[in-house]
């Protein structure tokens, strides 16, 4: 893998264009539109640089240059493995680890490794027990911001993203994108062992385990094995009797979210919650 240069980093490319300036009699401020800067679009204000296209402000020319690629569509860093291009070097380096298998970020508690530091920081909350995100509606706390956001939507019941093919609605755009693969027939995940293809990454990973060591999560009570930790957690409730989901209509408790959702659907007149 190697980056395409396209004049970046030299005095002849996009960088030199953005450095064009005009000094005004008022406050000095660099402004740049997506078509590239000109004497009519660049104004200086000390060490502050502003993008005329979206209003973003930067304290360095280099940051403005890098930001401009969002508007111009310039992606000078191309992966030789998959052909995907990226506007910034940092974005180019991260996907490289997918191809190389490099995972430089290691958890000091258990030794688990990750290809991104952000993934490691999220994972460490499992060991610390930290749950910094609290729902103002019900007081429930969460370790991960993504899970917290997903939970908040359950209070509003709003599903903003609708499928144009079948009309089904979703809380998140990512869920709609995933659903659309059903209509397009897209199966981007291919098993390198047997060649089988899958629509969803989660199903692909589960299939991949059939070629490896099997089910790494084992119940200490009965010895049953599971592919995922959350499956083991759910199974453990059959031994402990824990029922964390409560129906407010009948004050009935459920051990599984699927059973709780089905009961809630009855009360809502058949509408998915």
UniProtKB/Swiss-Prot annotation:
GO terms for cellular component: nucleus. SMART domains: ZnF_C2H2. Its main location: nucleus. A zinc finger (C2H2-type) spans 49-71, 77-99, 105-127, 133-155, 161-183, 189-211, 217-239. Keywords: DNA-binding, Metal-binding, Nucleus, Repeat, Transcription, Transcription regulation, Zinc, Zinc-finger. It is found in: Nucleus. GO terms for molecular function: DNA-binding transcription factor activity, RNA polymerase II-specific; RNA polymerase II transcription regulatory region sequence-specific DNA binding; zinc ion binding. GO terms for biological process: regulation of transcription by RNA polymerase II. The keyword DNA-binding applies. May be involved in transcriptional regulation. This is Zinc finger protein 80. It comes from Homo sapiens. The gene is ZNF80.
């Amino acid at each position: 893998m190697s980056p395409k240069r396209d004049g970046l980093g030299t005095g002849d490319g996009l960088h030199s264009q953005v450095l064009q300036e005009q000094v005004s009699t008022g406050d000095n401020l660099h402004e740049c539109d997506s078509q590239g800067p000109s004497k009519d679009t660049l104004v200086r204000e000390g060490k502050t640089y502003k993008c005329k296209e979206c209003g973003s402000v930067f304290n360095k020319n280099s940051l403005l240059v890098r930001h401009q690629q969002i508007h111009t569509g310039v992606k000078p860093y191309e992966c030789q493995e998959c052909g995907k291009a990226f506007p910034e070097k940092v974005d180019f380096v991260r996907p490289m680890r997918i191809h190389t298998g490099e995972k430089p970020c290691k958890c000091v508690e258990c030794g688990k490794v990750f290809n991104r530091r952000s993934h490691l920081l999220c994972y460490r909350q499992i060991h610390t027990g930290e749950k910094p995100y609290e729902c103002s509606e019900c007081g429930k706390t969460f370790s991960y911001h993504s899970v917290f956001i997903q939970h908040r939507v359950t209070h509003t019941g709003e599903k903003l993203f609708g499928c144009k093919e079948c009309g089904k609605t979703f809380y998140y755009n990512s869920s709609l994108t995933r659903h659309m693969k059903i209509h397009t027939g897209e199966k981007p995940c291919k098993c390198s062992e047997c060649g089988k293809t899958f629509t969803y990454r989660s199903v692909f990973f589960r299939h991949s385990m059939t070629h490896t060591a099997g089910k790494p999560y084992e119940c200490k009570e009965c010895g049953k094995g599971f592919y995922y930790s959350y499956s083991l957690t759910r199974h453990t409730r059959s031994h402990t009797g824990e029922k964390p989901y409560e129906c407010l209509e009948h004050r009935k408790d459920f051990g599984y979210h699927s059973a709780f959702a089905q009961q809630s659907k009855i009360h809502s007149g058949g509408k998915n919650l």
